[in-house]
Amino acid sequence: MPEFLEDPSVLTKDKLKSELVANNVTLPAGEQRKDVYVQLYLQHLTARNRPPLPAGTNSKGPPDFSSDEEREPTPVLGSGAAAAGRSRAAVGRKATKKTDKPRQEDKDDLDVTELTNEDLLDQLVKYGVNPGPIVGTTRKLYEKKLLKLREQGTESRSSTPLPTISSSAENTRQNGSNDSDRYSDNEEDSKIELKLEKREPLKGRAKTPVTLKQRRVEHNQSYSQAGITETEWTSGSSKGGPLQALTRESTRGSRRTPRKRVETSEHFRIDGPVISESTPIAETIMASSNESLVVNRVTGNFKHASPILPITEFSDIPRRAPKKPLTRAEVGEKTEERRVERDILKEMFPYEASTPTGISASCRRPIKGAAGRPLELSDFRMEESFSSKYVPKYVPLADVKSEKTKKGRSIPVWIKILLFVVVAVFLFLVYQAMETNQVNPFSNFLHVDPRKSN
């Protein structure tokens, strides 16, 4: 009866499959993890070694004597399944020492997303990393770093050679089995990469607090908008009655919305007619905005009180110093001034689009030749044409008059020709009249004596 391994995790997945098929064990459908085949090996094959255990046999230890012929088919998966099982049993003790640490790490391999911030910090310190503060934004980065360190640790363990006793050819064959164990470790590394697909719950968990915060903010905003400040008057007898100003405000409010001041007036007695003469204080609703109406404490006699409703405006400054109280007339004047200013702006800029800030911007023209833009001649031609057509607004009067006179002296061409013909005819007539006249003043010059010339 062949002896089977007590720790089948030494074998690779392919060897486990071949052993199970050789011993007529039905395998599960589809591709399964190595742990599934290890469990099948323990249930069906390792269980066969248990009956001889009470007799004092040690299944974990290697056999005392074994021939080389039995160990030769160890690296080859084939017909010698029984001999291969014996040889693996011989190497079992040594190989389990190597693979104990990865198995223990697999047991300790928890989901990184389930670790708390302190546990994650401890794991990083174990790997020699000095992390900073772990918060919601940096947690993902440290989780990725921890996964990388675990992968590197498993790869370094699989790549480091183990010291072996080189006394005979048997030890060399044991080293061959160690190589197969190394290959099994590589398969486990690939499984760790498959475990990285569990990062999807990271996104879900990161999103859940955001949604909870949003819900809380919306809930708080609804409460802050529902906050109401009420001022109630309780009049007693005709002689006097206590004046109580009850201010009620919601305690739960969003952090960003400014809190309102809660003021409680002191209890004091006031005559009945004084209350009737004074202006009644209505209920003021505290809105979620920064401005609110708060009734100041009333001191002294009500007879000298003026019908002025003080208004305190709270700004966004942490101290929230109240501003100077304003009367109703001043508030009305300010609103009228604002309206007038708005009308003036609309009159000055009628074609400007109205914006909430009152600031309008126009597109900037690009600088020619800047930022490596090519120079285009068309731009310069446009400039020349514009400069030639440019006409100054202010021209001296003398130039304008000269231009008008020049335009008025311009004579049509046919009038010029007519005048030329008239002048020519006049000169011709004058010449003819001079020839017919005997007393010609130029006759002495025309008829020269030839003798004088000789």
Curated annotation (Swiss-Prot):
Residues 109-153 form the LEM domain. It comes from Homo sapiens (Human). It is a single-pass type II membrane protein. This is Lamina-associated polypeptide 2, isoforms beta/gamma. GO terms for cellular component: cytoplasm; membrane; nuclear envelope; nuclear inner membrane; nuclear membrane; nucleus. Residues 78-93 have a biased composition (Low complexity). InterPro entries: LEM-like_dom, LEM/LEM-like_dom_sf, LEM_dom, LEM_domain. There is a cross-link at K401 (Glycyl lysine isopeptide (Lys-Gly) (interchain with G-Cter in SUMO2)). Belongs to the LEM family. The modification N6-acetyllysine is found at K207, K389. CDD domains: LEM_LAP2_LEMD1 (cd12940), LEM_like (cd12935). Residues 47-117, 149-265 are annotated as: Disordered. Residues 300-374 are annotated as: NAKAP95-binding C. Residues 5-48 form the LEM-like domain. The chain crosses the membrane at residues 411-434. Residues 299-371 are annotated as: Binds lamins B. Pfam families: LEM, Thymopoietin. The modification Citrulline is found at R320. Residues 107-117 have a biased composition (Acidic residues). May help direct the assembly of the nuclear lamina and thereby help maintain the structural organization of the nuclear envelope. Possible receptor for attachment of lamin filaments to the inner nuclear membrane. May be involved in the control of initiation of DNA replication through its interaction with NAKAP95. Thymopoietin (TP) and Thymopentin (TP5) may play a role in T-cell development and function. TP5 is an immunomodulating pentapeptide.
